[in-house]
Amino acid sequence: MEYDGRRPYSVLTRNEITVKMKKQINEISDIFFISNSDATVLLMYLRWDSLRVSERLGENKEKLLMDSGLKSVMIDPSPDSSSEISLETDVYEFDGDNDLISMPFCSHKFDSKYWREYLEKNFYYVEKIQTTISCPDQDCRSAVGPDTIEKLTVRDQEMYERYIWRSYIEGNKVLMIKQCPARNCDYVIEFHQENDDDDEYSLNVVCICGHIFCWRCRLESHRPVSCNKASDWLCSATMKISDESFSLYPTKTKTVTCPHCLCSLESDTKMPQFLTCVCRLRFCSRCLRSEEAHKIEAVDSGFCIKTEVGILCEDRWNVCQKLLEQAKSDLEAFEETNIKKPSDLLREQDIMIIREGLMLIVQCRRVLKWCCVYDYFHTEYENSKEYLRYLQGNAIATLQSYSNTLQEQKDIVLAAATYEECTFFRHTIPTATSNIGNYFYDFMKTLQDGLVDVKVKSYNGGTGPFWYCDRCTYANTWEDNECEMCYDDSASLVGEISDLFLNKVS
């Protein structure tokens, strides 16, 4: 079991869950002198609530056994009662009594083939777990326990064990446990109920396999987006956004979005020029192609063609997803090279510093990916959208700068011949990692709080004859979709002249 006292959950293996389950079964069996098979049925019937099982057995044992199907029932002795069993629309006929398997609480008999078909169709392969398994006869409520399953094939017994395990995980009323949703992962997360209301830690769960998921909805970690919005985004039928209101709006300052990392760069002129982003991509400000691709295009056509297709939410999502996968690959490559095969020149402290930095980049990339969803849902005010993209652009640029610094220092440390060459690294990177972590924490809090910095109370009232611009507080009529003062060319010119005058005076 992997447990950290600072975290409100534990990571358990499949074997540890099985041990806890069998211990619970044995306790009920020993205290109330019933078989392990009956104890298993009772716990499944009452959703693994040992306290409730104990109370019911102490109050009225016979009634509980009758309600759960663990009491013998009288069977109609008609000749057709065991010769033909109808299950919904299926009809199965038995030729004889050879190799028929019965249950201890009724006289219905079925062969192993029918048992397999019945269990797989109604219990093993259904999405919703059932509390208990009952007799295949529609009119019989006798419970099917492990003592009956033991008479079936080994394959059927293994399927039944997995079914009980699923019942313990998905139908448990007492323990807060969920299986890690990552593919091919058998780890189980047990959440400690005393810390359930702690929002600071209860949202994201980190499994030993490396997968990070939301405890509430079991989707991948989607901070700072809520569970409902994350589900709406992922369950969208086409994931294509055609409305122009969801695309990136041009601002009054000439800005260009990097096609690789989505950073916003300012352009000093309307003429095409080559810009160098913090991600080290050099591209044309007009066609948004890399310098090499731009030169090839210019040679073929004689000039570059302006890219008219805007960067939509889906485009931003895909770009951020690729960057996230690249960050994960960098982390896995470092762990494979330096942790599993440590070098004599690297201290354990140095390895952990680099690993923490790479892990932080993965987490920040995941946050930036889910921030793209905000642009999809946040359509209320244009200035709010501009401020949102401004925050996203700063976060992207800050993370890219940190990533470049970490990569440079990592290369220096890995190539260092003496420990003294790592002195600067040991002081710089931990501080930078802490700063980036704090920066993204504040960034997520800003988004989760609803971007209150760009909203004004006058917007929410809606009763006066004017609405006030949240940038310059100018009173606009409700017929105006944009602020007359902010988007007036003459007003912009006056502002520029005023700035020039102030600069000369100073």
Curated annotation (Swiss-Prot):
Zinc finger (RanBP2-type): 462-492
Zinc finger (RING-type): 83-140, 258-287
CDD domains registered for this protein in UniProt: BRcat_RBR_ANKIB1 (cd20346)
One GO MF term: zinc ion binding
Residue positions binding Zn(2+) 5: 284, 287, 294, 304
Region span, TRIAD supradomain: 79-308
Residue sites binding Zn(2+) 4 per the record: 258, 261, 277, 279
Catalytic activity of the protein: [E2 ubiquitin-conjugating enzyme]-S-ubiquitinyl-L-cysteine + [acceptor protein]-L-lysine = [E2 ubiquitin-conjugating enzyme]-L-cysteine + [acceptor protein]-N(6)-ubiquitinyl-L-lysine
Pathway it works in: Protein modification; protein ubiquitination
Reported cofactor(s): Zn(2+)
Keywords: Developmental protein, Fertilization, Metal-binding, Repeat, Transferase, Ubl conjugation pathway, Zinc, Zinc-finger
Gene Ontology biological process: protein ubiquitination; regulation of double fertilization forming a zygote and endosperm
Binding site for Zn(2+) 1: 106, 108, 135, 140
Residue positions binding Zn(2+) 2: 180, 185, 207, 209
Free-text cofactor note: Binds 4 Zn(2+) ions per subunit.
EC number: 2.3.2.31
Alphabetical list of Pfam families matching this protein: IBR, UBA_ARI1
UniProt zinc finger (IBR-type) residues: 158-227
Alphabetized InterPro entries for the sequence: ARIH1-like_UBL, E3_UB_ligase_RBR, IBR_dom, TRIAD_supradom, Znf_RanBP2, Znf_RING/FYVE/PHD
Family annotation (SMART domains): IBR
Comment block on domains: Members of the RBR family are atypical E3 ligases. They interact with the E2 conjugating enzyme UBE2L3 and function like HECT-type E3 enzymes: they bind E2s via the first RING-type zinc finger, but require an obligate trans-thiolation step during the ubiquitin transfer, requiring a conserved active site Cys residue in the second RING-type zinc finger. The active site probably forms a thioester intermediate with ubiquitin taken from the active-site cysteine of the E2 before ultimately transferring it to a Lys residue on the substrate.
Protein's job: Might act as an E3 ubiquitin-protein ligase, or as part of E3 complex, which accepts ubiquitin from specific E2 ubiquitin-conjugating enzymes and then transfers it to substrates. Negatively regulates male gametophyte formation and double fertilization.
Family: Belongs to the RBR family. Ariadne subfamily.
Misc note: Transcripts of KPL and ARI14, encoded by adjacent genes organized in a reverse orientation, have the potential to generate natural cis-antisense siRNAs (cis-nat-siRNAs) pair targeting ARI14 in sperm, thus leading to opposite expression levels during male gametophyte development.
Protein name per the record: Probable E3 ubiquitin-protein ligase ARI14
UniProt source species: Arabidopsis thaliana
